[in-house]
């Protein structure tokens, strides 16, 4: 699934259809320039403007016979393709709303071929455009060619689309059909099937309640006005409104496209809530506390164990960081998002996208699960108490659906209190019914958890010292809060409000906001990276989904006040599509992944900077090539250090039915040290070293 104005209408017209994706639709390689132009047009433009250039009435302007096209210079057309177009426009006497996304990720040759085909293939007698002309306009406008910045839909980069479009954990639950006046009739079986498709394919962007998140709202007042035929075209071909090309991309059959076009005109079904009765029914103590070991019953160096997510098999692997041997493969919730380690480093808490938490005891002869609970239908975050006197005692988990967080007893996972996050947005002060809980971190300054509420843009300081009389401090940040981490002092929490293109800074000691820092574009730090900059002192860094920027922010208000909470430097990495950036106190390297970059060479490698000579740029290491896995996407994701900072581990993430591996690199020499290639390592993604995770070392 890939998401994709020319300075006037060709841009809008020509490429608002780009939701078709960048994959060629012709299996036979083009033999002529005209065929190449047609193939590129069909792959990138025909979804909206239709294969014959006729457009879609009321939605996407025609290219064939367009008076707008003939009024533009070649340079204007090229600029529109590169930078996009928006706003009202009139084409051949009819009004349209320009929604042409930027297509800068296409090569100069492809853009030239498409424009030439539109000029002389769809139309006749128009001028050919050369790749050299495109290159000149690209250079004069300073437009990047990074494929991760291309937009199949306005505002949605290729990398962001891949990241946000994951299936919702709500799929599979029973929902009640609501018959909606004015909507096409559907049987109960059809409604159930369509609900399942929506939760699997669409809810990640549009929200469970279709109120809009990354994607636009899809409520009946909007969809009924469009009508079934319009919706079928958008679902089938894709559109700038945010829908991928589910039909032409092979994701949905013609019957399913028709089904979804009818379903979207009905009132969205409400998935069931998940309150205390449901949690208690799911809560299981597999090994009571009284029957657990009173001391470590194995010889593993607990500090150097790695908890590795096996995404598609619903498992984690515990791997000995000294011997590289797999200690145990443990069944967990589906697609574990994170592992968090208790302060004592005895317990591992995992949470799956399906809302299931598993508690693993590392003291057992063979580490295994001792308790489990399901805290919602979809979730991403879990954390444990770290403040002195409360170590290992309290846990918290946050859900996407229902939007809530849950306080739990640490050693048993007994649910203690549930708190809803539904409320008003920080900017427009409007009620939001589905504000999802994103990152949660444990404060080192107070007995508090710091909770990011994504859609409202509020950061909650949840005091766990008295759960019966729970006290919550609410800080106004920015919408679409996601992940983040501590500065080196563990006083200041820096977190990305990714769609707002900001980093929010919280002073956990004073329990207040420090400020919001503008960054670009779609920051995604993971926990971020802390190091001493040769010029600016202590900094924290984040990479991005939307471009190649590696943004460094000063974090030392006492020693370097002029640089504190400002962007002090922006490095250029391989490209956009980055999820994680990492260094270690004992390392002089900064590692940046790009697993969601559409360019396979970038997705399969890693960029590494020398912290003592950042101006020298980065070195690229061929991690996937070193793994020697054969076919597959082989995305290289999440650098993770071992306990002492001497090694960096990388997941080489392949398809479920393909070989995957973990590659271990010597941090000092940047050379291959080992490949952990075991058939049980199915789709490895996140890796969490016990010591570094428990002690917030990054």
For each feature predicted by the language model, list its residue ranges.
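Sequence/structural segment immediately N-terminal to covalent heme-attachment motifs in c-type
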Residues: 30-56, 65, 69-83, 150-154, ...
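Extracytoplasmic electron-transfer domains, predominantly the class I c-type cytochrome c fold
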Residues: 64-128, 164-166, 184, 204, ...
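C-terminal motif of bacterial Sec signal peptides marking the signal peptidase cleavage site
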Residues: 16-19
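Predominantly soluble domains enriched in secretory-pathway, periplasmic, or organellar proteins
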Residues: 21, 157, 162-175, 181-189, ...
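Aromatic- and Gly/Pro-enriched helix-to-coil junctions and flexible linker segments
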Residues: 117, 128-129, 137-156, 252-255, ...
């Amino acid at each position: 699934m890939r998401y994709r104005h020319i300075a006037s209408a060709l841009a809008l017209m020509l490429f608002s259809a780009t939701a078709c994706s960048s994959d060629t639709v012709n299996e036979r390689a083009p033999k002529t320039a005209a065929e190449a132009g047609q193939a590129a047009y069909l792959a990138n433009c025909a979804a909206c403007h239709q294969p014959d250039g006729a457009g879609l009435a009321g939605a996407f302007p025609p290219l064939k016979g367009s008076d707008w096209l003939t009024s533009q210079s070649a340079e204007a057309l090229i600029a529109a393709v590169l930078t996009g177009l928006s706003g009202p426009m009139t084409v051949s006497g009819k009004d349209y709303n320009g929604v042409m996304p930027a297509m800068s990720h296409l090569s100069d040759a492809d853009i030239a071929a498409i424009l030439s085909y539109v000029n002389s293939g769809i139309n006749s007698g128009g001028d050919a455009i050369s790749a050299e002309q495109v290159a000149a306009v690209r250079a004069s406008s300073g437009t990047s060619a990074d494929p991760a910045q291309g937009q199949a839909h306005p505002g949605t980069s290729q990398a962001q689309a891949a990241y946000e479009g994951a299936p919702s954990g709500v799929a599979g639950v029973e929902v009640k059909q609501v018959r909606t006046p004015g909507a096409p009739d559907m049987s109960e079986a059809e409604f159930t099937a369509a609900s399942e498709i929506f939760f699997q394919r669409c809810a990640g962007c549009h929200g469970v309640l279709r109120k809009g998140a990354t994607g636009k709202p899809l409520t009946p007042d909007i969809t009924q006005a469009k009508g079934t035929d319009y919706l079928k075209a958008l679902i089938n071909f894709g559109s700038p409104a945010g829908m991928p090309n589910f039909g032409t991309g092979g994701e949905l059959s013609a019957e399913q496209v028709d089904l979804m076009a009818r379903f979207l005109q009905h009132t969205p079904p409400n998935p069931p809530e998940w309150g205390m009765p449901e949690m208690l029914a799911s809560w299981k103590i597999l090994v009571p506390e009284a029957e657990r070991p009173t001391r470590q019953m194995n010889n593993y160096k607990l500090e150097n164990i790695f908890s590795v997510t096996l995404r598609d098999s619903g498992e984690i692997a515990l791997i000995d960081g000294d011997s590289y041997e797999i200690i145990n493969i443990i069944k967990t919730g589906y697609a574990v998002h994170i592992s968090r380690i208790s302060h004592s480093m005895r317990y591992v808490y995992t949470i799956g996208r399906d809302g299931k938490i598993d508690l693993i005891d590392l003291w057992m002869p063979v580490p295994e699960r001792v308790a489990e609970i399901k805290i919602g239908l979809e979730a991403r975050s879990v954390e444990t108490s770290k403040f002195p006197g409360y170590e290992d005692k309290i846990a918290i988990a946050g859900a996407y659906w229902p939007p809530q967080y849950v306080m739990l007893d640490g050693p048993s996972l007994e649910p203690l209190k549930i708190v809803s996050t539904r409320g008003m947005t920080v900017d427009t002060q409007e009620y939001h019914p589905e504000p999802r809980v994103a990152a949660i971190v444990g404060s080192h300054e107070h007995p508090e958890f710091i909770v990011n509420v994504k859609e409202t843009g509020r950061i909650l300081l949840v005091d766990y010292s008295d759960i019966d009389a729970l006290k919550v401090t609410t800080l106004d940040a920015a919408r679409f809060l996601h992940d983040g981490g501590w500065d080196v002092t563990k006083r200041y929490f820096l977190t990305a409000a990714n769609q707002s293109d900001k980093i929010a800074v919280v002073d956990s000691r004073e329990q207040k906001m420090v400020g919001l820092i503008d960054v670009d574009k779609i920051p995604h730090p993971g926990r971020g990276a802390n190091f001493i900059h040769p010029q600016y002192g202590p900094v924290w860094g984040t990479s991005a989904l939307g471009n190649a920027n590696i943004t460094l922010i000063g974090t030392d208000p006492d020693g370097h006040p002029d640089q504190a909470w400002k962007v002090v430097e922006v490095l250029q990495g391989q490209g956009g599509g980055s999820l994680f950036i990492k260094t270690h106190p004992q390392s002089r390297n900064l590692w940046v992944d790009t697993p969601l970059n559409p360019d396979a060479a970038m997705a399969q490698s890693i960029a590494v900077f020398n912290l003592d000579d950042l101006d020298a740029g980065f070195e690229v290491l061929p991690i996937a090539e070193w793994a020697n896995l054969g076919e597959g996407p082989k995305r290289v994701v999440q650098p993770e250090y071992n306990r002492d900072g001497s090694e960096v581990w990388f997941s080489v993430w392949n398809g479920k039915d393909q070989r995957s591996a973990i590659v271990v690199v010597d941090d000092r020499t940047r050379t291959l040290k080992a490949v952990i290639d075991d058939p049980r390592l199915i789709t490895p993604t996140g890796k969490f070293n016990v010591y570094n995770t428990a002690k917030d070392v990054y």
